A protein has these predicted regions:
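Alpha-helix capping/helix-boundary segments
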Residues: 50, 105-106, 113, 158-160
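Histidine-centered beta-alpha loop that forms part of the nucleotide-sugar donor binding/catalytic region
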Residues: 15, 102-103, 125-129
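Short His-centered aromatic/hydrophobic patch
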Residues: 80, 101-107
Length: 174
């Protein structure tokens, strides 16, 4: 007798405020919707400012994001011990076959998930920037996380170059 195939469980981490418009959030939403249509079990962990108006039942709010000025813009991220506890709980309860972390080399839920996770981890890199002293200063903290990734994806050649310049590793461009 054939056993029915179990649906692959994929945990996706969005580093930026889910309810703030942005390219990373749109990328994650479209990918999640496509994977759900294909029969995968998807759970997205993200910072959320307004949980009451959250429309996607597959998004798990991790807490309110904190605005941080970066490169002339403001990134709404979540980081710290309370966020780390929520990340570990989400990973444990999700029992994921695979984790997909977006921007795993910035202080955010993605970095916390990388530190907490065991098993296959895919990292997608979106950012592109010139070499920055701050990255070199915290490189020893970030390097093990980047090295822990089973696979690395860059959304552009510029993002790939940024990854290579800062972490001396490579990624597949999609």
């Amino acid at each position: 007798m054939n056993k029915p195939k179990e649906k692959l469980r994929i945990g996706v981490v969005c580093p930026y405020g889910w309810d703030t418009p942005g390219g990373v959030q749109t990328h994650i939403k479209q990918l999640a919707e496509h994977l759900i249509q294909d029969g995968y079990r998807i759970s997205v962990l993200a910072p959320v400012s307004d949980e009451e108006n959250l429309q996607e039942d597959w998004v798990v709010p991790a807490g309110r994001p904190i605005p941080i000025p970066v490169n002339g813009s403001v990134a709404k991220v979540l980081f710290g011990p309370i966020a780390a506890t929520r990340v570990r709980q989400w990973i444990n309860e999700g029992d994921f076959n695979l984790l997909h972390l977006h921007e795993p080399a910035i202080p955010s839920l993605s970095l916390l998930a990388c530190w907490a996770a065991n098993g296959p981890i895919v990292g997608t890199f979106h950012a592109s920037s010139k070499k920055r002293k701050a990255i070199y200063a915290i490189g020893p903290v970030l390097d093990p996380a980047v090295e822990k990734l089973s696979a690395r994806i860059a959304v552009s050649e510029l993002a790939r170059t940024t990854l290579k310049d800062h972490f001396e590793t490579d990624a597949v461009v999609i």
